Amino acid sequence: MNTGIRKDHLRKGETVSWYNSVIAGSVSGVFARMATAPMDTVKIRYQLQPVQEDKYKGIASTVRTIMKEEGLRALWKGNIPATAMYVVYGAVQFGSYSWFNNVWSAKFPRFSQQGQTLTVGALAGMTSSVVSYPLDLLRTRLIANRTSHRTSVAEECRQMWLNEGVRGFFTGISTAMTTVTLSTAIMFLTYETVNIVCENHEKEFWSRPVSASSGIIAGFVSKTMVFPIDTLRRRMQVMNSKRTVHFTKFPAVYHEYRYKSSTAIIYKILRQEGVSALYRGLTMGLCKSVPTTAISLFVYERTMDLFDHGQRWGRSP
């Protein structure tokens, strides 16, 4: 039962149109990307920087360095595949979540709310990561390029096809699936748990502001918990590229990752660069991920509200 502060379309028992959810998810993806594109570039540059290199030090300094060496537009490198990825990812994530949520509620009516949210969120994350992965990899490759020459999406695709084949578009997908599955499950679980707690204490003075911040809280928790795996994913996405000389002064670092398992790569990073390497870029990651998650969830819910209002208006005499 949803007695809360506002309708929650992600709640167990809520019957949501899969079609409407896909549209709302696409819209949320566009808004989320528009707000955070430059931060994404800075975050990924941090994650890809080996410990031997000390080029990018602080957020402001990194932005100045990128603009000085590559121009202002460099902060939007990879924006075309990234925007497409956010649209596809948002559509599949929320669409599959609604579908799994409806099916799970019908098949397992006694399943707990939090248990269902965690399970359905994981399934939605796994599905969306597989569908959108080639776009995610393209985004990382384009952002990693430090030269002033702007590689086009078509050129990058052609180089990947010639040098790596079809498999090149899915390099590191198992790690990505782990990252996104965990992140999505934690995000939806945190979001729903915060809203449930607020509904159970709706008369308390803090319930409304905390409920309004549920998307921010969900983004913070999910990103912090999976960031080390996300760093591993980024490094694996560029390790087979023939352009690694354009990504760092120490391309041999990435070459050493080739033909190794994700476990072996993490061990190598820990041994050569320390634990801090897995968290490099976390501050910018939170600056980007927290508003991204909050905007995505907010826009999705408000778009679904518009669909609800439209249906009620259509039924009115």
Curated annotation (Swiss-Prot):
<protein>
    <recommendedName>
        <fullName>Mitochondrial thiamine pyrophosphate carrier 1</fullName>
    </recommendedName>
</protein>
<feature type="repeat" description="Solcar 2">
    <location>
        <begin position="112"/>
        <end position="197"/>
    </location>
</feature>
<keyword id="KW-0472">Membrane</keyword>
<feature type="repeat" description="Solcar 1">
    <location>
        <begin position="16"/>
        <end position="103"/>
    </location>
</feature>
<feature type="transmembrane region" description="Helical; Name=4">
    <location>
        <begin position="168"/>
        <end position="190"/>
    </location>
</feature>
<dbReference type="InterPro" id="IPR023395">
    <property type="entry name" value="Mt_carrier_dom_sf"/>
</dbReference>
<comment type="function">
    <text>Mitochondrial transporter that mediates uptake of thiamine pyrophosphate (ThPP) into mitochondria.</text>
</comment>
<keyword id="KW-0813">Transport</keyword>
<feature type="transmembrane region" description="Helical; Name=2">
    <location>
        <begin position="80"/>
        <end position="100"/>
    </location>
</feature>
<dbReference type="GO" id="GO:0055085">
    <property type="term" value="P:transmembrane transport"/>
</dbReference>
<feature type="transmembrane region" description="Helical; Name=5">
    <location>
        <begin position="205"/>
        <end position="227"/>
    </location>
</feature>
<dbReference type="GO" id="GO:0005743">
    <property type="term" value="C:mitochondrial inner membrane"/>
</dbReference>
<comment type="similarity">
    <text>Belongs to the mitochondrial carrier (TC 2.A.29) family.</text>
</comment>
<feature type="transmembrane region" description="Helical; Name=3">
    <location>
        <begin position="118"/>
        <end position="138"/>
    </location>
</feature>
<keyword id="KW-0677">Repeat</keyword>
<feature type="transmembrane region" description="Helical; Name=1">
    <location>
        <begin position="15"/>
        <end position="37"/>
    </location>
</feature>
<dbReference type="InterPro" id="IPR018108">
    <property type="entry name" value="Mitochondrial_sb/sol_carrier"/>
</dbReference>
<dbReference type="Pfam" id="PF00153">
    <property type="entry name" value="Mito_carr"/>
</dbReference>
<feature type="transmembrane region" description="Helical; Name=6">
    <location>
        <begin position="281"/>
        <end position="300"/>
    </location>
</feature>
<keyword id="KW-1133">Transmembrane helix</keyword>
<keyword id="KW-0999">Mitochondrion inner membrane</keyword>
<dbReference type="InterPro" id="IPR002067">
    <property type="entry name" value="Mit_carrier"/>
</dbReference>
<feature type="repeat" description="Solcar 3">
    <location>
        <begin position="206"/>
        <end position="306"/>
    </location>
</feature>
<keyword id="KW-0496">Mitochondrion</keyword>
<keyword id="KW-0812">Transmembrane</keyword>
